[in-house]
Amino acid sequence: MGLKLLESRLCLLLLLGLVLTLVSCQRPTPSQKFDIQHIYKKSSPKCDDAMRVVNKYTGKCKDLNTFLHTTFADVVRVCHNPPKTCKDGTSPNCHDSSSKVSVTICKLTKRARNYTHCRYKTTGAKKSYTVACNPRTPKDRPTYPVVPVHLDRLF
């Protein structure tokens, strides 16, 4: 009896560990990825530090990345501006911001095998931007029905 109880507890523990592993390994939704890659609420980041977070999801050094110094909620509001065709010439779900925001552009200067050792040049600017927006996925927070999924361009 004691052995069976121990075995069942061990199986339960293993099952719980497997479930937790699967949950923690889930990929972010497109809007969560957008938030990770492009929203930086603080003032200008050091690109070497900020890009470690971005690169963690692919395990590789991203060549170029732009951080918008604004909130996710502010970018969601841009999704309600009039739609236009995206830079690819086919997607009709892009929207221009109404005002300029501070941005930080990170350009790869030294690639490394380990993404945590990549080096970037940091450039700051004030730019307007265009984002592509889609309906939220079931895994997104229900707060916003439409969410940004791609930073299309700066202007």
Swiss-Prot record:
EC number(s) recorded for this UniProt protein: 4.6.1.18
Active-site residue numbers: 38 (proton acceptor), 150 (proton donor)
Domain of life of the native organism: Eukaryota
Signal peptide: 1-25
Glycosylation sites: 114
Keyword Signal among UniProt keywords: yes
One Pfam entry name: RnaseA
PROSITE patterns recorded: RNASE_PANCREATIC
Role: This is a non-secretory ribonuclease. It is a pyrimidine specific nuclease with a slight preference for U. Cytotoxin and helminthotoxin. Possesses a wide variety of biological activities.
Protein name per its UniProtKB record: Ribonuclease 2B
Protein species of origin: Mus musculus (Mouse)
